[in-house]
Swiss-Prot record:
InterPro entries: Fibrillarin, Fibrillarin_CS, SAM-dependent_MTases_sf. It is an enzyme of class 2 (transferase). Changing P129A: Decreased methyltransferase activity. Its EC number is 2.1.1.-. The keyword rRNA processing applies. One of its GO terms (molecular function) is RNA binding. Involved in pre-rRNA and tRNA processing. Utilizes the methyl donor S-adenosyl-L-methionine to catalyze the site-specific 2'-hydroxyl methylation of ribose moieties in rRNA and tRNA. Site specificity is provided by a guide RNA that base pairs with the substrate. Methylation occurs at a characteristic distance from the sequence involved in base pairing with the guide RNA. This is Fibrillarin-like rRNA/tRNA 2'-O-methyltransferase. Keywords: Methyltransferase, RNA-binding, rRNA processing, Transferase, tRNA processing.
Length: 232
């Protein structure tokens, strides 16, 4: 296996780039829980610090960063509501980034999958798993505070509407949303670019200002991620 030569801070807080002796580069985050990985990712020791390799083929946020995300609203101390947290791959890296003074509320609908998320959260006190349906934010309103960032990665035809509805409950004015648009979950017959355009129009008609749209290919085919700011 290739060995790490250097680890450098990127222009995004708490996100690093690891360079290996085979000439390759990988994103990584500083491991909040040393000696433990989450999804089989490589642990990298460099100058007394342990980092976790962040696989862009397993995490759409990592893919977005490698595809040119201009700014990452998730930083040290950020409060995040994550819809579609699944078994914890991406939210574990969010946990590394926000550190212990941040909070990541992870909503997941599948009882089987949320059990895996609970195992991740047992070692990471800044992750708060919630077994809930994102279509009904009223059901977790009593436990989720207002957040700085809403991250949405759910495979539903009305995924954008669900995101907007949750923003009305939880996202601070001038907060940021990262919405993963899964074109094939919305309409398998349409050109993904047309779907992205339609979904962005929905956001803009609901007081969101579009900052950036990123096509996630080759990391995730027929997916885009939209960064927008909520105007309330």
């Amino acid at each position: 296996m290739s060995e790490v030569i250097t680890v450098k801070q990127t222009n995004m807080e708490n996100i690093y780039e690891c360079e290996f002796n085979d000439g390759s580069f990988r994103l990584c985050t500083r491991n909040l829980v040393p000696n433990f990985n989450v999804y089989g990712e490589r642990l990298i020791k460099y100058e007394g610090v342990e980092y976790r390799e962040w696989n862009a083929f397993r995490s759409k946020l990592a893919g977005a960063i490698l595809k040119g995300l201009k700014t990452n609203p998730i930083r040290k101390g950020t409060k995040v509501l994550y819809l579609g947290a699944a078994s914890g791959t991406t939210i574990s890296h969010v946990s590394d980034i926000i550190e212990l003074n941040g909070k990541a509320y992870g909503v997941e609908f599948s009882p089987r999958v949320v059990r895996e998320l609970l195992l991740v959260a047992q070692r990471r006190p800044n992750i708060f798993p919630l077994l809930a349906d994102a279509r009904f934010p009223q059901s977790y309103k009593s436990v989720v505070e207002n957040v700085d960032v809403l991250y949405v990665d759910i495979a539903q035809p009305d995924q954008t509407d669900i995101a907007i509805y949750n923003a009305k409950f939880f996202l601070k004015v001038n907060g940021d949303m990262l919405l993963v648009i899964k074109a094939r979950s919305i309409d398998v017959t349409k050109d993904p670019k047309e779907i992205y355009k339609t979904e962005v129009e929905k956001l803009e008609n609901s007081n969101f200002e579009t900052i950036q749209i990123i096509n996630l290919d080759p990391y995730d085919k027929d997916h885009a991620i939209v960064l927008s700011k909520y105007k309330g």
